[in-house]
A protein has these predicted regions:
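AlphaC helix of the eukaryotic protein kinase fold
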Residues: 16-35
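Activation-segment/catalytic-loop signature of the eukaryotic protein kinase fold
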Residues: 47
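Conserved short submotifs of the Hanks-type protein kinase catalytic core
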Residues: 51-65
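AlphaC helix of the protein kinase catalytic domain
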Residues: 66-76
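Activation segment signature within eukaryotic-like protein kinase domains
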Residues: 84-85
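Protein kinase catalytic-loop region centered on the HRD/HxD motif
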Residues: 90-100
Length: 392
């Protein structure tokens, strides 16, 4: 469908003559997802009743669900699987911090758009923390946590278990827990461990055995305590896969960063610790790096090249090597207030806010001090420009 007023494509979910329970589910989806604004969560624009119809108007995503990529003949590269799960982790962490538990994480509820960006969908049985918990089994048996199957109150760790099941299937093309019927599946989830992931995919690094064991632990005490913890281990795994293929060795990257003004007051060990919260990316001239209005949890440090910052199509700043940008979205947790475009070919350090929170306190303190210095410099330049224009 097309929104004629805003001139954008939208998706419509329409139900006719549904029961009060189904109507409640539909509006719960709108209420749960509607309070969330995240690049990896499908946006809800509007919901309502019209005669005997219930409807939700939502973001249109051109792509397919992860179900296609969970089949043995369509498995994605390992690094792409990790990136997908990492981004879903980030989305879930965002939702959990706002009191929303999804409760039905599965491949068919995660869209993958044409650019490979995952979008978490269908909050129809989500639970909002301030609401009274309903008794009963909620979810899809093959992806439900042991505590959900026992009709206990699901928590954010229940979502982690379900995401672990999705990750297992993405990597192997096989469900973690299978059976002839739901009773067999429920028994296996509550009593048995799945086949070790490396028996099905021997090319996986050993760290994946530890990640899957913690994600699919039956005990809450042994399971990952938060999505942030899982995301951190996924970043460790990704670096282990990607670094041998990179243009530079770890030592070369550290030496490069030590020459960047932003890191002049960092020790070598502190720069090394940033490796797990960041990635080095190349951006060609003319490519948009961040877009005004986007919600994102990453910020950037320009290592080489030039970047232009635009607001309403007007250039408001030029970023040079050694300077950071995008930090206000991280600090304030709000939408991007400007766009950034590569003015030349650029080498960037892209830093994840969710993983920066796991960095040592001393490293975080240095970052905030350098952010403050950057903001002070920009304000000083801005004031100088205003003074200059007023004196003319």
């Amino acid at each position: 469908a097309r929104d004629a007023y805003i001139q954008r494509q939208v998706a419509l979910k329409i139900s006719r003559g549904i029961s009060s329970q189904s109507r409640k589910k539909l509006f719960l989806e709108a209420q749960s997802a509607g309070r969330l604004s995240n690049p990896n969560i499908l946006a809800i624009y509007d919901t309502g009743l019209y005669k005997e119809f219930c409807y939700i108007i939502m973001e249109y995503v051109e792509g397919q669900t992860l179900k296609k990529w969970c089949r043995p003949q369509h498995l994605l590269p390992i690094d792409q699987c990790i990136e997908i799960v990492f981004k879903v982790c980030s989305a879930l962490s965002y939702a959990h911090q706002r009191g929303v538990i999804h409760r039905d994480i599965k491949p068919s509820n995660i869209m993958l758009d044409k650019q490979g960006t995952p979008k978490l969908t269908d909050f129809g049985i989500a639970r909002i923390s301030e609401q009274k918990s309903e008794k009963g089994v909620w979810g899809t048996p093959s992806y439900m946590s042991p505590e959900q199957l026992k009709e206990e109150t699901g928590t954010h760790q229940s979502d982690i278990f379900s995401l672990g099941c999705v990750m297992y299937e993405l990597l192997t093309g096989q469900r973690a827990f299978t059976g002839e019927n739901d009773f067999t599946i429920i028994y296996k989830i509550t009593r048995e461990n799945p086949t070790p992931v490396r028996e099905l995919r021997p090319d996986l690094p050993k760290i994946f055995e530890d990640i899957m064991r913690k994600a699919l632990a039956k005990s809450l005490e042994e399971r990952y305590a938060s999505c942030m913890d899982l995301a951190y281990d996924l970043r460790v795994a990704l670096r282990g896969i990607m670094l041998p293929k990179g243009d530079k060795k770890v030592e070369d990257i550290i030496d490069l960063l030590r020459q960047v003004p932003f890191f002049h007051n960092f020790t070598r060990e502190q720069i090394e610790s940033l490796g797990l919260a960041s990635s080095i990316i190349k951006v060609p001239e003319g490519k948009i790096i961040v877009t005004e209005g986007d919600i994102d949890d990453t910020f950037y440090i320009l290592l080489n090249g030039k970047v232009k910052i635009r607001k309403n199509d007007t250039v408001i700043a030029k970023i040079r090597a050694g300077e950071c940008f995008g930090e206000m979205a991280y600090i304030a947790g709000k939408a991007r207030v400007a766009s950034a475009t590569a003015h030349t070919n650029c080498l960037l350090m892209k830093i994840s806010a969710i993983l920066m929170d796991k960095a040592p306190d001393a490293v975080q303190l240095l970052f905030f001090k350098n952010f403050a210095r950057t903001l002070s410099y920009r304000l000083e330049k801005s004031s100088g420009l205003e003074t200059g224009s007023n004196s003319k």
